[in-house]
């Protein structure tokens, strides 16, 4: 690419990054540890309601997993609820519903920072550390309490190790494991419960969350995991006294696909239950009184009393008689006032003073009879503070917008002045204008897939009407597009039970036949011209199929007999040595072998091309790249690459016959449309809840590497977009008379204009109700598309391949 285009691209990326740095700043927080404010001497002399705290965090424990009939298998918890020794709540978790910001909320009571959702996956990030921020953890440590911690090592990223007298962290992102990751926590229990040399015991279990990511909320592995966690709760309950409070909670919930990060009811409704033998001596919460557990299904997962998750913080602080953390937005849970007796009013007034100080409001003297109005006012202040929790850096916002405005103007000038006025350029300008204007509506952002669907239908319909000679190809393309449309659920507002992907899950024989057919068709593409390379591709395809079958077996999916036989024979040849390996042991070596074989084939083909330059270099490598993308794709989506192959063939025929003078220009524009359409129809959305981690660990052992996992995650989630981007550059090499930089101007124009308009929309909507659940994730996706597709794929990888091709 020419220096001018590269310079514009770097300036565009820099402008968006500057804007993001101003839009997602670290929040300003009150430093230091809190002290009692109201009747301080009296409070310091009070006895706590409990002596010890056991906190069991079950990652992604949705409220229905804990309370709902036919869903929950926490039988012992239900028994305790019915005896009054457990009080249940549905705790609302503010989005983004990922672990790191939710743990911040649970421990400090503060509102989440959306940047934490991004930092959540950065293993070596230290910017989220809470060493200098007040929390009930730091308060317990300051008061000389001994804290033992076992589980998700996110806690060790948040808090200094000196806060914990004993700790053992487990990696939270190796989602392929949902057994050992919990066993490593539970193995500490016998010793901890026997010696009880702690005041606070924190256990954070990850297995349930991993099961959700792997198989969804209704996975066959969910009931056994519920029972396992229920047994842990029973084990703790049986060995602690009535002066110990056991709290079981989810840090967030999950949607039906098993993902989280967004703002749907399932993701924000976490279960929470307080357990103690002492509780049966006090009146139950009104919502629980006379109700038998497990309960029937509730609308939007609202079971028993609904509280804010941050309300846990002042409640725990009050029950254990420590100051409420300075930055807490929580409001004391009124149901626990009976445990504090005559001092309940003192604690509520203390909470009132703390919250008003955080809101910078003056507090007037209050009488004991004003408790109800005080709690109501606190709830109002809580809601206001939660909405205005972020301090935007306006200098960086406007610098980013100003810089991007200049870049966009320059890019638009270069594109419009160099482009011929034809159907391809008009279509690109129309698509850019339509998408750019749509970002100002939250519903358009949530349902963006609808826009791309109607764009492709309109374009193909227009082409069919004006070029009827290509009727068969148009018809085939439309049939494939409709099949693509119905393959998965897309968007965030509506879910459908009968999708092609769900049907394939329930008919595994058909699914695996289609997987075989897809790999065979892709691998043997061009067999008559390059039989040797096709055989190598077939070897890579075979390794991919064997790995996918093993993965399915390990994760409880059904695979047909012929697939099992193939796996057995292939593995006996590949891993001979006398020691039989089970499918789980084979996963990592199989994936690594696949990537090594693929890399060897690519290197061999590049070396061959250096000696014998061939114009079809990229088209010969394209099937192998497609197999790599298939490797990073969920099995039910793999047949879509067969659909893509048919669509690509039809599209090339339409352009060859109907658009001979603008073939490559039109393919570039249609490639951009199909990148976005196929991304959404693969199940993607503009919510971080649909980021799929399933294939992020192919070939990764327990030695978690953020960079490798991040790369695999990006390839897996952007596989369809990468496919269509590479398809466009293959056609460019074969047929284009223009330079790649000239062709690339069209996509640069699209990305620049849409980036600018989204940044403007984010400024306009910064106090909108959906700023964190809709516009902020969209901004994150904009960064992802710009970096992964626009920069790494189209500006780094594709020009490199064209250079090698000569």
UniProtKB/Swiss-Prot annotation:
GO molecular function terms listed in the Swiss-Prot or TrEMBL record: CP2 mannose-ethanolamine phosphotransferase activity
Topologically, how does it sit relative to the membrane? Multi-pass membrane protein
What EC number(s) has UniProt assigned to this enzyme? Answer: 2.-.-.-
**Residues bearing glycans:** 70, 184, 242, 488
Q: Which GO terms describe its cellular component?
A: endoplasmic reticulum membrane; plasma membrane
The entry's localization annotation reads: Endoplasmic reticulum membrane
Q: Which residues cross the membrane?
A: 396-416, 425-445, 451-471, 508-528, 532-552, 593-613, 624-644, 664-684, 706-726, 745-765, 782-804
EC category = transferase
> Major location, coarse class?
endoplasmic reticulum
- Please list the GO biological process terms of this entry: GPI anchor biosynthetic process
- Keyword Membrane among UniProt keywords: yes
**Keywords assigned by UniProt?**
Endoplasmic reticulum, Glycoprotein, GPI-anchor biosynthesis, Membrane, Transferase, Transmembrane, Transmembrane helix
Pathway, according to UniProt?
Glycolipid biosynthesis; glycosylphosphatidylinositol-anchor biosynthesis
**What biological function has been recorded for the protein in this entry?**
Ethanolamine phosphate transferase involved in glycosylphosphatidylinositol-anchor biosynthesis. Transfers ethanolamine phosphate to the GPI second mannose.
Record-stated family: Belongs to the PIGG/PIGN/PIGO family. PIGG subfamily.
Q: What is this protein called?
A: GPI ethanolamine phosphate transferase 2
Task: Tell me the organism's taxonomic lineage.
Answer: Eukaryota, Fungi, Dikarya, Ascomycota, Saccharomycotina
* Gene designation per UniProt: LAS21
